Amino acid sequence: MKRITALALSLIMILCAACVLAEDAGKNEIGTLKVGEAFSIQSRMPEGYTYMPVTETELNMVGILSAGAGKPAVTVSIAYNEEYADTERFNDVDEAVVEEIRDSFREADEEVTFEDLETAYGTRLLKVSGDGFVDIYTIYKGYELEFVMTGDSFTDADVQMMVDFISDMDFVTVE
């Protein structure tokens, strides 16, 4: 009886490990950032997109999600900000700070509009829309993340694609 129980538990553990590995299958490493501890950033690419790194340092990275015809281009920017060193998620900053962030977008373009969104896991996102761009902004573990779509027009499906991409993103600690 003990052997059957041990065998059953072993089988369950193997199946659980396989499920975890299957969940990460298909995710591409986008880059590695390091402030204190290092993070490998991984995500599944949206359909039709590939990631091309432009610059990467220990504190920040910039890349482009390249797409086929008819899809908006996306610039990915992830940068460490000392001001948010103790901030786990954008949800954790108070509304005065959110308003300062909005003001910084208004400085570049007074006509921008804002909409609050959230990832599948409840992380707050700030959608900033202007002429020819949609910027999706958030904060995670002290990093400011921006995903800027550029093009002539954007559909709700384009915006949802970016929200899904951000929702799927993993910051995996590198040892």
Question: What spans do the regions from the language model cover?
Answer:
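Bacterial N-terminal signal peptides
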Residues: 8-16
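Signature of long, low-cysteine stretches enriched in small and polar/charged residues
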Residues: 99-141
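Short, solvent-exposed coil/turn segments at beta-strand boundaries
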Residues: 44-48, 69-71, 120-122, 138-146
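Short, well-structured beta-strand
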Residues: 123-175
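Short, hydrophobic/aromatic-rich segments at coil-to-beta transitions
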Residues: 27-32, 57-63, 118-127
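Sec-dependent signal peptide cleavage junction
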Residues: 15-29
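Secretory pathway targeting signatures of secreted, lumenal, and periplasmic proteins
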Residues: 38-90
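Positively charged n-region of N-terminal signal peptides that target proteins for export
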Residues: 1-8
